[in-house]
């Protein structure tokens, strides 16, 4: 942000932002991005495309990685630019996901304009800013390993243990009757508790402005752990997890199935699992 008034508007929720990082040809190799910004007078002219832009169709502004030094090494020719979404040169197109939701968008820049004062961190210094933000993003995404939910924002009404008892049955002690499956659920719960303590430490470091190097590992483990949670739910539910819509399935069953489908992207978005290792 370039002014204190802009920061104040964010805190008051008067301005909604989206993030313009990934491009159709630049995902894991983000620094190969090709969206360019050319200086023209006291502004930049932006052309290119971003993809997987969360809530771009609802955002007022986008903080965007753009190439301003085409002759520089790829990491050194990137700038961090703030761009108004409400202008003729910016269009968005929602992407419908397999879960049925459309939180992501394609974002197109066709001679979009941004004032030079909205360049953050200095010309060709955007990669440093972006890396810092990615540390926070990965910490945030990793939290789905604790909360569940296919997109990290919604929880199913019942947890893994409750789903296991409901669909796999219980013994006289009200424990999951299938001992092998019960062991899987118990191990998942123990790992959740251990991961929670780790996330507390990472969170404390983040609060003081020092994102931990553990953010990458937390993102890796949290997303893989969340995917496993839903795999175990479906293992317990059996054919009850095969519904998409219509009669014969409860709302919770349909929600779990859709969330399970959504979790397949957890280990891709925000940096693939392979990139974190």
Predicted segments, located by residue:
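C-terminal helix-coil-helix/basic helical segment that borders enzyme active sites and/or dimer interfaces
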Residues: 172, 193-248
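Glycine-rich phosphate/cofactor-binding loops in nucleotide/flavin-utilizing enzymes
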Residues: 127-146, 237-277
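A structural signal for short hydrophobic beta-strand segments in well-ordered beta-sheet cores
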Residues: 35-38
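Single conserved hydrophobic/aromatic residue that forms the stacking wall/gate
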Residues: 1-7, 11
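Glycine-rich phosphate/pyrophosphate-binding beta-alpha loops
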Residues: 26, 51-56, 98-99, 265-270
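Glycine-rich beta->alpha junctions and the first turn(s) of the following alpha-helix
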Residues: 90-197, 266
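A short core secondary-structure module
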Residues: 43, 47-93
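A short, Trp-centered hydrophobic/proline-enriched beta-strand micro-motif
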Residues: 13-21
């Amino acid at each position: 942000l370039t002014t204190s008034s802009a920061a104040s508007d964010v805190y008051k929720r008067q301005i909604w932002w989206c993030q313009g990082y990934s491009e159709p040809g630049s995902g894991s190799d983000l620094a190969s991005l090709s969206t360019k910004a050319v200086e023209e007078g006291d502004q930049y002219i932006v052309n290119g495309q971003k993809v997987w832009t969360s809530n771009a169709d609802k955002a007022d502004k986008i903080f965007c990685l753009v190439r301003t030094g085409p002759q520089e090494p790829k990491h050194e020719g990137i700038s961090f630019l703030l761009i108004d979404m409400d202008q003729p040169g910016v269009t968005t197109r929602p992407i419908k996901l397999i879960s049925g939701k459309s939180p992501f968008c394609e974002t197109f820049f066709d001679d979009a304009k941004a004032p030079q004062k909205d360049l953050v961190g200095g010309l060709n210094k955007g990669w440093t800013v972006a890396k810092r933000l990615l540390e926070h993003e990965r910490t945030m995404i990793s939290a789905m390993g604790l909360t569940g939910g296919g997109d990290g924002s919604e929880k199913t009404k019942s947890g893994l243990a409750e789903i296991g008892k409901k669909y796999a049955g219980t013994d006289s002690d009200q424990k999951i009757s299938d001992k092998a499956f019960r062991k899987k659920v118990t191990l998942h719960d123990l790992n959740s508790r251990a991961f929670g303590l780790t996330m507390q430490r990472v969170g404390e470091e983040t609060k003081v402005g020092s994102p931990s190097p553990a953010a990458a590992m937390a993102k890796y483990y949290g997303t893989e752990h969340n995917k496993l949670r839903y795999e175990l739910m479906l293992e317990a539910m059996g054919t009850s997890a095969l519904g998409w819509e219509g009669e014969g399935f409860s709302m919770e069953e349909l929600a779990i199935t859709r969330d399970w489908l959504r979790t397949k992207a957890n280990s891709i978005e925000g940096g693939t699992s392979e990139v974190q290792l």
